[in-house]
């Protein structure tokens, strides 16, 4: 049958009929159809199709053939084939009618219903025969992969592909293995096997490829390129698709391969077109698909390499990303653990508090709270607004105990004992809080549970985060701040004294303001705004004061640490000398020597009494000593 004239057609159809490249268009899944709003969605790839009348025309593509005489062997054999044109005439008639009255880009006669895609509308489909319509697969059949076995695949009837048993003698192709260019498989979550015609000349492929097509290209007759096309059966042929089980004679893949590829999704169209554009090259020997992961390669390629001589290579090996092995969650864990005081199972359990501690907290909240100046100077709140501003710091505890919580090496038997120590120390101090004591509202004891050494395991071992000279100071990482001297740990007692003076002035200003309740309604919002500004400035100053006070504490603790080490080393040396020279006079006993060393070397205690130490430094600074009595401290002239 002659091809339809393309002279009067629109350019899209003219190009399609002039082109001999068959575009692999697969049977779209109903999910794609349902999600597509464009009525021409299924037929966009039709622009590149060549509507061929006879399936035998698909065997040879004459584009790359330079010598037509080389094809006489094939044409002589193919002339003996019966021409099956009944179905194809109907298809060509449909295409002619469609192109004669409509354009592909604006097919108004095709609606957006699913029945229109199946060719079942009542006015435009060429298939109105009840017998043909009865053979049309339903949507349930098209989506029946979930109920089918993995080896089930879409199998097309023999009427669409008819080849005589021995059209080509085996002697015509000595030592040449020719496999069909299988169509791109139907989109499915199951593994589909490529159908191979049961002809003697076309041998089954034993070479897996890393794409959705099985392509073996050979050089024949003096390296002349001949592209063999077995009929592509993956276009949308309305009302002619049947779902049949695979023939028993076809070998199946091993169970390991099937299970591994059970959830794979096949590529459609695009990968096949990409494969076609590659150069036609001869492949010799066995090819191994390049899989993305080593585990997947071992799992899927081992059965193929062992049993592949008699198997049909499947076409899903290039789309295995969905079934790659998921790495174990334990492998993702870091070797070093930063949660030294928190275990994984403890995070799920809420921290338990004893009711006695809650009662103590309530009692402390009921007590009147106030700031302390230098030692004995008390600044009592004189109005309600200042008390509201002080409510943010009701949960404050002695800094000595809170420092104990934050020390990484601190160990105790229970959180209750630590809370008891906190409450006792708070009672001893009479709930007095110094101006430089600022709480972050949540102490580490309320956030996390301290682990005993017996509870340590490989996941809670200390890491380099807790080294003394590491990048991090203490348990928590250094937070980003706007202060440029955030890493400078040199104390500046004079700056701390100035902050204290500013805080006293601010408290005086806030206390002198008229209470909001005594102001008229129109003036209350402005008064509240001004007081909030003053309170915010006081809050910022308290943070700075706490930072400066912590630097003073750190300096004092380091000095005391060095002095204690000196005392210990000195007394150890005395003990060694006493043991080595027992005949020497023992006028001062070892206990007396130790007391003398402590008295001469150690000054006032710092550890456990950091608040008193800071107040002593502030007192000396107020008297005119810029260093505040800190040993070894040198204040730059710019900061004096």
UniProtKB/Swiss-Prot annotation:
Region of interest called Basic motif, as start-end residue ranges on this chain: 524-533
Domain of life: Eukaryota
Single GO molecular function: DNA-binding transcription activator activity, RNA polymerase II-specific
Post-translational modification (record): Probably degraded by the proteasome.
Composition bias, Basic and acidic residues: 372-381
Localisation per UniProt entry: Nucleus
Alphabetical keyword list: Nucleus, Repressor, Stress response, Transcription, Transcription regulation, Transport, Unfolded protein response
Cross-referenced InterPro entries: bZIP, bZIP_sf, CREBRF
Domain bZIP: 522-585
Record's compositionally biased regions (Acidic residues): 356-371, 382-402
Tissue: Highly expressed in intestin, testis, heart and kidney, weakly in brain adipose, colon, liver, lung and skeletal.
Annotated region (Disordered), positions in chain: 308-414
Annotated region (Leucine-zipper), positions in chain: 534-541
GO BP terms in the entry: maternal behavior; negative regulation of endoplasmic reticulum unfolded protein response; negative regulation of nuclear receptor-mediated glucocorticoid signaling pathway; negative regulation of transcription by RNA polymerase II; positive regulation of prolactin signaling pathway; positive regulation of protein catabolic process; response to endoplasmic reticulum stress; response to unfolded protein
Record field: compositional bias (Low complexity): 317-329
Gene Ontology cellular-component annotations: cytoplasm; nuclear body
CDD domains documented for this protein: bZIP_AUREO-like
Assembly notes: Interacts (via leucine-zipper domain) with CREB3 (via leucine-zipper domain); the interaction promotes CREB3 degradation.
Protein family (similarity comment): Belongs to the bZIP family. CREBRF subfamily.
Functional summary from the UniProt entry: Acts as a negative regulator of the endoplasmic reticulum stress response or unfolded protein response (UPR). Represses the transcriptional activity of CREB3 during the UPR. Recruits CREB3 into nuclear foci.
UniProt protein name: CREB3 regulatory factor
Species whose genome carries this gene: Mus musculus (Mouse)
Gene: Crebrf
